[in-house]
């Protein structure tokens, strides 16, 4: 873990906290934010950045999900359950975001200290273990078969997944992103995605193999730790942990120079999302 510690050890972490913006903060804005910050960091115009974010009742689909044979029926089902639906601009499959899920992005220069793909994932895994080290639990990174959006860096306790990590690289910057299920029922979130896939596939043969979701493979941290641990609790732990690695944490929003790039990125992402969902005018 020494290399992941070295990435966390920065002279300064820029902190962009968007965890309490409420239901009007749209998930497409988040992806535009990370693309903008990645570009600034890649250009050497920004320090390494931690961005935290929460979105209310949103299902984030992957590109492969947009090719489901009965996608419209699946989306109608999700909307009936009061969920917004978007397609993200990177790989992976469907995930659930709501008020009980904290999302964290770590963004740093790609060239710095030779960051390969696994090292980016290891850095986030190490951060989460440090945040929760006072609990007597082992946090493993391995694929949890039966979970939604399964991957080799699923984070789990006793084989129940509470977090998933993804990674995006753009213009010399790296964004390592994680969703952390803090409160609520992990199995209920998983059941929602299972039912979405059932409606969107309807037993048809597909070129891509979609996950067969077993809701009991997923849980929230509150369920796994036996006590309520809220998004706000995780935010406090996150900031305290980053303070151990950096002498300076600097609260920030987008700079004047970053705002035009953000607006360009947001429009591009909106257009791509509409195309993926067949919403083009």
Curated annotation (Swiss-Prot):
Belongs to the octanoyltransferase LipL family. The lineage of its organism: Bacteria, Bacillati, Bacillota, Bacilli, Bacillales. This is Octanoyl-[GcvH]:protein N-octanoyltransferase. Pfam families: LplA-B_cat. SUPFAM superfamilies: Class II aaRS and biotin synthetases. The active site is at 149 (acyl-thioester intermediate). It catalyses: N(6)-octanoyl-L-lysyl-[glycine-cleavage complex H protein] + L-lysyl-[lipoyl-carrier protein] = N(6)-octanoyl-L-lysyl-[lipoyl-carrier protein] + L-lysyl-[glycine-cleavage complex H protein]. It is an enzyme of class 2 (transferase). Disulfide bonds: none annotated. Catalyzes the amidotransfer (transamidation) of the octanoyl moiety from octanoyl-GcvH to the lipoyl domain of the E2 subunit of lipoate-dependent enzymes. The record marks 161 as: Lowers pKa of active site Cys. It comes from Bacillus cereus (strain ATCC 14579 / DSM 31 / CCUG 7414 / JCM 2152 / NBRC 15305 / NCIMB 9373 / NCTC 2599 / NRRL B-3711). Pathway: Protein modification; protein lipoylation via endogenous pathway; protein N(6)-(lipoyl)lysine from octanoyl-[acyl-carrier-protein]. One of its GO terms (biological process) is lipoate biosynthetic process. InterPro entries: aa-tRNA-synth_II/BPL/LPL, BPL_LPL_catalytic, LipL, Octanoyltrans_LipM/LipL. The reaction proceeds via a thioester-linked acyl-enzyme intermediate. Its EC number is 2.3.1.204. Keywords: Acyltransferase, Transferase. One of its GO terms (molecular function) is lipoyl(octanoyl) transferase activity. Residues 44-250 form the BPL/LPL catalytic domain. The keyword Nucleotidyltransferase does not apply.
